[in-house]
Amino acid sequence: MRKSKAETAETRRRIVEVAAEAFRANGIHATGLADVMAAAGLSHGGFYRHFESKDQLVAEACEAGTVSILESLENAAGASVGAEGLRAVVDAYLSSAHRDAPGAGCPLAGMGSELARGDEGTRAAASRSVEALVTLLASRTGDPQEKANRSQAVFALSAMIGALTVARILNDPEASDALLSDVRQQIEAIAPIEPIEPI
């Protein structure tokens, strides 16, 4: 019996969701398509009915992971802007909860080095993720298109991704917590002193 378009779309969404978590938690190359399909409750043979390649799935999983982390950071910041808004985003990103849940975290921290070695479509998806996170950070400190705000946001995002990655590497929990705290403080030191008025 053929599936309806809605059922097919739901199956595809489920595959992307499972892959996004698995790729972030375990790495792209360590996660086989058979693993993804089994976790989604599907047979391995059905993969190519939905995707042309693993690379296509990686790109879509990166985009899905980005939507998820953006929602999480937006919820953490609420309506806060200026220094308070930037602080809320940075605190949520560089939290022990984010560090300890890589499968639900930022795809750039969870898959970054593998995304950099991906095909053109994968790197394009990752580039859109970078742009979305830079825009989020820049919008918390003023006009997201203003060069100074974007430069500050690029610096902050780069530091955040690096710090989260290193914090996950460290096997000493106290050192990992201290690293997250130190980088939070350094990023927050560059935030604007006076909050801006909401638009």
Question: What do these predicted regions represent?
Answer:
Residues 119-128, 140-199:
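Hydrophobic/aromatic-rich alpha-helical bundle segments in the mid-to-C-terminal region
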Residues 63-68:
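Short, basic, alpha-helical segments at the C-terminal edge of helix-turn-helix-like DNA-binding modules
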Residues 17, 83-98, 154, 177, ...:
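Amphipathic alpha-helical segments that line or abut small-molecule/effector binding pockets
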Residues 85-89, 99-127:
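Amphipathic alpha-helical segments used for helix-helix packing
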Residues 14, 18-25, 72-75, 159-166:
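Solvent-exposed, amphipathic alpha-helical segments
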Residues 60, 74-105:
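Hydrophobic alpha-helical connector segments
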Residues 1-10, 194-199:
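N-terminal intrinsically disordered/low-complexity leader segments
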